Amino acid sequence: MALLGNEKIYLSEETYNKYKNEYTELVTVERPAVQASLKEARAQGDLSENAEYDAARDRQSEVERRILELERILENAEIIDTKSAVQNKAGIGATVRYLNMKTNKELVVTIMGPHDSNPIENKISNESPVAQAIMEANGIGDVVEVEVPQKYNIKVLDISYAK
């Protein structure tokens, strides 16, 4: 996931901790292990046809890329705080029941940041068209338009936040 500038990255506390632990593991365990592999491969002499050296360089690239990615995520992270959320107004962390007025079906979703979204668990990204529409609603009972190629309306039926 590409990050631009200093944009906020909304994360659940669980995901923040997972990324923080991954970062620590990469910096304290993986990076030194890769450096040791490179040193060992260099000691074998001719690097031009050294598969172990090439593999270690590839792994080093992967590790360093992921370290940089995690640094950007953690530096720009904002942990989702549902305790201070405005009740009856949907925001990140809200579980929302709504009616798709085109299909006449009720759906329940939880609005999360992109790193926590999981459609299988009905967790949608705050950047998705449905979440954007829900967050523009003034509250329960409001009807809003979902901005997709074939626009449709939804009605917010309930908004709740985990305690």
From Swiss-Prot:
Organism superkingdom: Bacteria
InterPro entries in the cross-refs? GreA/GreB_C_sf, Tscrpt_elong_fac_GreA, Tscrpt_elong_fac_GreA/B, Tscrpt_elong_fac_GreA/B_C, Tscrpt_elong_fac_GreA/B_fam, Tscrpt_elong_fac_GreA/B_N, Tscrpt_elong_fac_GreA/B_N_sf
Cystine connections: none
User: Which UniProt keywords are present, listed alphabetically?
Assistant: Coiled coil, DNA-binding, Transcription, Transcription regulation
Any coiled-coil regions, as ranges: 49-80
| GO terms (BP aspect) | DNA-templated transcription elongation; regulation of DNA-templated transcription elongation
- Gene3D superfamilies for the chain: Transcription elongation factor, GreA/GreB, C-terminal domain, Transcription elongation factor, GreA/GreB, N-terminal domain
One GO MF term on file is: RNA polymerase binding
- Known HAMAP family for this protein? GreA_GreB
Report the family membership: Belongs to the GreA/GreB family.
Matching NCBIfam families: greA, PRK00226.1-4
What is the role of the protein in this entry?
Necessary for efficient RNA polymerase transcription elongation past template-encoded arresting sites. The arresting sites in DNA have the property of trapping a certain fraction of elongating RNA polymerases that pass through, resulting in locked ternary complexes. Cleavage of the nascent transcript by cleavage factors such as GreA or GreB allows the resumption of elongation from the new 3'terminus. GreA releases sequences of 2 to 3 nucleotides.
Identification of the protein by name:
Transcription elongation factor GreA
- The gene name on file is greA
